[in-house]
Amino acid sequence: MEFFLDPSIWAGLLTLVVLEVVLGIDNLIFVAILSEKLPPNQRDKARLIGLGLALIMRLALLSLISWVVTLTSPIISNNFFSLSIRDLILLIGGLFLLFKATIELHERLENEDHENTENKNYASFWAVVIQIVVLDAVFSLDAIITAVGMVNQLLIMMIAVVLATILMLLASKALTNFINIHQTVVVLCLSFLLMIGFSLVAEALKFYIPKGYLYAAIGFSILIEIFNQIARHNFMKNQSRKPMRQRAAEAILRLMIREKNNNKNRIKTDNKAEIVLSSSLETETFKDEEKYMINGVLTLAGRSIKSIMTPRSNISWVNTEKTINEIRLQLLDTPHNLFPVCKGELDEIIGIVRAKELLVAIEKNIDVYTFASQIPPIIIPDTLDPINLLGVLRRAQGSFVIVSNEFGVVQGLITPLDVLEAIAGEFPDADETPDIIKEQNSWLVKGETDLHSLQQLLNTKELIKQDDCASLGGLLISQKGQLPLPGETIKINSFSFHIVNATEYRIDLVRITKN
């Protein structure tokens, strides 16, 4: 009992436990890396068995203290070097550590797939356990000799080794999980093992490297990695604040971006391998149409209804107050299949009719108002989001839906074709001209052109800063503060917008140049 009341005993025990843990950190790192080679359900078992056998081996070595001490006596000696059993063990262990760490580093640097658990070839369970025990034998030797040099009581040494091993067991799973989550730490740990293996070989050959240098290098590397992990954590935190859809869009768009210099600076070569690689890159590159469509799909949910719809000014509608002959001529001259039928003005919608069916009804002298009222319009608010709009269009069964504001004023209409154009680009009707015409060093653009489509064509994100503007004309009016006159030029970031044609109430045509 007096044995445990001695403060010096407790101080020696505490110091020895700390030293055993410090000396066991390199072993712990190697255990964590080896455990990853096993299936997830076997990792804990291998770790426990490996460290458990290592504990038994350390206790056995402690019980043979007198024999362990003699391991430092030279067995090979000449004028150039001398080697003891301890030196041989350190040499073999150091070389094995260098070999194993180099193989692991090669796999990491070659970027082999460590995440595909379905097709991953796992190592044998007992092969990993044996490696853990063998490496622990090398690391144990230093720990046991340190214990013998510090404390005289065998019981204290055994207690310290047991406590240190228990702490290592508790920390091993957390360390393994941390390394599995943070893959950059694996490369850092393997670099540590290379340093440790080199120091073991140097020590065995009597080239003494101060431990302080080794620990200082490891400590500094850990500090740099801590900064790296903090930076990565902050980056992920900032990314998590973005909507999931935006993050997915940015990630996919980054995959589609191709460096223009890769095409401009491509060097012609007769090397067959380089030709094959070049052609494969050509085939794997996203085409402009594919980029446009993928971007359209990913950004669809974030757009407003106004940016998708056919605006009020472009709606062809049938006025019941016109004569039958006027209505017949309108139906025959306009290349549309569906028409809203209204009484006097567009806001007084009676119904939606097909041109062919209405012509047949007129020939049968059926009243236009009565015929149109059989198919009432589907009206949606201009605040509806595009995702819910798709469900409404499905219920419309091939017809279109009318977009109205909170005051009941018709803003436009949307057909399934409008949604397709928002994704894949413009499909002009027979009576339409393209919204955007590419000139030599500029673009000739209609004022009613959708801003999202224009942004994609110009490959910029500088135009849409708020949701109030859906068209180019609306953007320029908002930028100017009033309706600009023909001949005026408005500059927005790196683009110049020259007003080619404008009326008293809208912008018709704009020429865009990049500064």
Curated annotation (Swiss-Prot):
The chain crosses the membrane at residues 14-34, 49-69, 79-99, 125-145, 150-170, 185-205, 207-227. GO terms for cellular component: plasma membrane. PROSITE patterns: CBS. Keywords: CBS domain, Cell membrane, Membrane, Repeat, Transmembrane, Transmembrane helix. Belongs to the UPF0053 family. It is a multi-pass membrane protein. One of its GO terms (molecular function) is flavin adenine dinucleotide binding. This is UPF0053 protein BUsg_314. InterPro entries: CBS_dom (IPR000644), CBS_dom_sf (IPR046342), FAD-bd_PCMH-like_sf (IPR036318), FAD-bd_PCMH_sub2 (IPR016169), Integral_membrane_TerC (IPR005496), Ion_transp-like_CBS (IPR044751), Transptr-assoc_dom (IPR005170). The keyword Cell membrane applies. It is found in: Cell membrane. Residues 309-368, 372-432 form the CBS domain. The keyword GTP-binding does not apply.
